[in-house]
């Protein structure tokens, strides 16, 4: 069997990284002195790393992060915000995912909620968990459209399948009865089967009022399913008069680019 035939078969089996590495080995005279087991191990390592990297890129792309460059390592703890660094570091290990626990991130507009949620999502991707980011307004529209078209169960799977679901702009506007009902179906399906990261401008104590004015039993049903055993991060301002928004800190504010 010729070397080219071997390369062609590797490519046919979609072992392209291994094929490229094998070609490089064949062109390198010094590799003739390397034992076969070592050379073969090098080829396997290259193919393995390539597949891992491609898988990570695919997970990040499919997550549709609002801020795909977010990083736990880049979180600014000196920006006038009170942050629990120990808790953030613990959550970055993704242990909460294996425990099926949720994360609540609350804070004012521009406090860095979305950035932090996406940073947690990125860490989940690095652990090869599936993640999906969605704004609650878009989620509600998607669920209602599916309800109207008779495809609710199919669309619901789009949000129940990921191991980590990030819901941004959580309860920014009060829910109608129909919206709360659709949302309850989702929350009920993913409870203790996956983890959800909620980002909200409102404190947890105010969420009841945002769900049908707190009058519907759906408010109790939803809150009961998401609050138990959840981790809570409240991004508090130490000195509002000196604060920069996190959009400015991370260079995400279009006005800063002018």
Which sequence ranges carry the predicted segments?
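Short glycine-rich substrate-engagement loop in P-loop NTPases that contacts/grips substrate
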Residues: 81-89, 131-160
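Walker A/P-loop nucleotide-binding motif
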Residues: 100-116
């Amino acid at each position: 069997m010729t070397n080219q035939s071997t390369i062609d078969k590797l490519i046919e089996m979609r072992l392209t990284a291994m094929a490229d590495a094998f070609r490089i080995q064949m062109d390198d005279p010094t590799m003739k002195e390397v034992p076969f087991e070592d050379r073969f191990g090098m080829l396997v390592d290259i193919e393995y790393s390539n597949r891992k990297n491609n898988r990570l890129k695919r997970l990040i792309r499919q997550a549709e992060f609002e801020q795909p460059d977010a990083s736990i390592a880049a979180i600014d703890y000196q920006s006038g915000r009170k942050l629990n660094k120990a808790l953030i570091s613990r959550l970055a290990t993704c242990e909460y995912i294996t425990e099926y626990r949720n994360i609540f991130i609350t804070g004012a507009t521009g406090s860095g909620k979305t950035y932090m949620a996406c940073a947690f999502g990125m860490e989940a991707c690095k652990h090869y968990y599936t993640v999906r980011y969605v704004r609650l307004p878009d989620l509600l529209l998607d669920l209602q459209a599916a309800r109207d078209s008779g495809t609710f169960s199919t669309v619901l799977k789009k949000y129940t399948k990921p191991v980590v679901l990030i819901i941004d702009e959580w309860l920014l506007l009060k829910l109608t009865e129909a919206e709360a009902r659709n949302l309850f179906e989702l929350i009920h399906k993913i409870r203790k089967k996956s983890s959800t990261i909620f980002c909200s401008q409102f404190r947890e104590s105010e969420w009841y009022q945002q769900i049908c004015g707190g009058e519907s039993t759906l408010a109790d049903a939803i809150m009961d399913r998401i609050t138990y055993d959840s981790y809570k991060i409240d991004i508090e301002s130490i000195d509002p008069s000196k604060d920069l928004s996190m959009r400015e800190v991370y260079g995400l504010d279009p006005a800063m680019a002018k």
